[in-house]
Amino acid sequence: MKVEKRKIDTESIKKFWVGLLEGSGSIQVNHWKKKNLQFRLEIKLKNCNENFLMFKDIQKAIGGYIRFETSKKKERDQVVWIVDQKTEIERIIKIFDQYALLTKQKQDQLNFLKENLQRQDVNWYLKERDNKYKVRVAHPDYKIKDITYFNEWLSGFVEAEGCFCIRTSTYHSFSISQKYEKVLLSQIKEFFNITTQIKESKKNIFLLEVYKKVILQKLIHHFIEYPLLGEKNKSFERFKNFF
């Protein structure tokens, strides 16, 4: 299967970053001693060279800084991309005006951040912080086929949430899961003409898993043309060699 790889330019990285943020990131509003509000965009991934280099590309294209953390459980070290300066956050979130967030959770986080940036009121924040997912604002309806940046977005999202599984039985598979986002998984299912049913693996955690070879080949074609940029690309490279 020969497909020419796309050049990863700044705009492609922005689109990829939106998907990556939706899968493994967070849009945060916090407080310091109930006196001042603090704002933060963050993506945490396993600490490895591939993820570090991906974050360097994101840093160059978008901004932010990178640091390394040891998890509290000491299960693994993490590499973290962070933006925590208010003016830089205000600049970066304008990217979402062009490449909108697709998951309801991140849309709610962004709306809460914007409201607090405007209000700058610690008391309001303390009162409303537990309600940011309860008070639902009207989210735009969309069809993936109408989203011009979806291909790069999906690669970013899969970098965070996708899994390429190689089995000795030769029943290899690709899966992706997300909490609450059944509608989004349904759109991905439709985009690739997947016939497999979406399963609820745990409470409010939905799973889409694909075994069918013709669909897996279609997915492989996608990730060659719109490449994964971090550690997930290693598992993809091993996976595609079986087809």
Swiss-Prot record:
Q: Which InterPro entries match?
A: Homing_endonucl, LAGLIDADG_dom, LAGLIDADG_Endonuclease
Primary enzyme class: hydrolase
The alphabetical list of record keywords is: Endonuclease, Hydrolase, Intron homing, Mitochondrion, Nuclease
SUPFAM superfamilies (alphabetical): Homing endonucleases (SSF55608)
* GO CC term, one of those recorded: mitochondrion
* Classification via Pfam families: LAGLIDADG_1 (PF00961)
| Protein purpose | Mitochondrial DNA endonuclease involved in intron homing.
Name of the molecule in the record: Probable intron-encoded endonuclease aI3
The organism of origin for this protein = Dictyostelium citrinum
